């Protein structure tokens, strides 16, 4: 058989060479491509937009940014669970569901505080299940629940080596008992299983056979895809699953891959395209694995309101409408051609992969693609009667590239707008791929468009390709996402400056994106690092927040002048910090506009919705708004004043306009009002054990700290509202609390502030970790105030607590109160 395959392949190659020539065959074999069949269409589900522990607390990340990616599923901690100090279903369900989420899966074994779960006994575990399920079944989110009652039992930690049949049947018996326990509480409850850490045909088939015989079939089948072979093998795995269902005579139960993706590649846009495409092709639910933090949609946002590069892949996916098109991939150099020729596996690819859909109502194609380091081809064939040869179609090609897990990417880049012609019932075009880390989004519709080609090029310089002579640093791989898979570690204030040799053809002003890691020396507290960036005679000092782990990449951006020597030196100034360098990107500086777009996520219900990614807190003018119509900003109805100027907090903002009103852009407004008030710690009244101290890292030079639930401490102030309406409370804060230890997850604690206006509680507002106490960010909360003077209190009332622990507010540098309009 192996010999036959080789003979067949050699015959095919020989025929191709004779028919088309060696150059054409070489092109066919080397150029990656995906061909879509317009005549073969199926439902587009959006189910791959799911996350394991994607939310830490209420609105962390924000419901608006989650809605924009069409979030579909969430796997998280059961009510009252102790596995992590965050992610309790009681606290995150409202954010998830209000963002449009569908499947809310809870891991009931996350009642335990250890990993892997420290078993007391199965009867005691079932009692924990009884307690948590009973509570959740009386909740407002019960109709969305799916109970994953056992997670990764095939690791053998509870019941012994799974390769021994006796131990597997111990698990099946335990499953049956817990299954009927949950069903006794709610006969209509949905349960998920077996929950294995990987796909094993024999194990899953045996489990389903047992469940059929014992009337305890799950309502959702769960396994994990966490292998570097998963992209290759996922279609094969699903084919095996479908065949076992047919053989057993049971329906094809919906599948949720409740943990997908690799620690080393999650967060890279081009890799995310692959997982999304594989899952969408199977109509499967999927949740991105939780390898690091629980407060960033599994490395899909930079913080609670800021997109990173990976965010845009899920934003693109959330925009896709209509029917999915069947596809055929070809990327021989990233395939398993060796195993195929040996007869081990069918021919499979994990390089250039794409997903496409067609919206009949809009007569529009959407293509999501990535994973190639060279120009790659997209073809859509068998267009039939929908298009006629000679029809002109406009093609808009946008892309994003990896900028670190924590690097802000406020917009995708438009690479090209062009038109193509239908020929022979098909269309084709080339994507200008440069790196496998890139992801492309293509929108194709009838009609010609003004041509555009982006001439502003970004050039990347990998740290591992630079000279390390005399520096004392090392080139290493990393556990987490890296550009090119390598980085330079252990650069410190005691090593020589690190030098990037750049070869820009001309000098000038460039935006420099420095992608780095920053950790403290062993045993010391996390701190931000100051780096000196030198280009010729120009120096710039930049503050780099902690990245918590050495190979978890953050990004800082600055403008630099490239001079004749074409060197960029990076020197660490802060003692006690170890810096990792991944790469720098250099882009010629151009005018940067606030990114604004229509909000067309599949989860968005409003007809006239937009979003804007705001670079910094302030007043912005929305073009086209000329009356006092109500404008809804992040769920708050704001009365306009005719000038279209509103206060926005930094990051992602959802804007809903009245019917018939639209705007095409936003720009910073030089707008001053007499009622803006900035309160520093020394200008407020202190209560309880709260303390004011100096802090050079805040805008005021001081901070307000130690606001705790057990000391009735806080700060209060008086504010006179000039008119009734919404006011922005922009709070400058730092938070670096951590609760517990985990082998790879970082158990950050999101502190909260309880705000009271005239004695009436407005809510608990959570503040995402800033990773160190010396790095401050801002969060904007919008509250309605009647005209007149108000007493406003900022405290932590202890109404929410993990495991009955004392709770704290973040450190506060200043509070700004200002009318939104």
Listing of model-derived features with the role each one plays in the protein:
Residues 58, 114-244, 264-275, 300:
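Active-site cleft segment of glycoside hydrolase catalytic domains centered on the general acid/base Glu
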Residues 53, 76, 149-150, 193-194, ...:
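Conserved beta-strand positions
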Residues 56, 79, 152, 226, ...:
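Flexible loop residues that form catalytic
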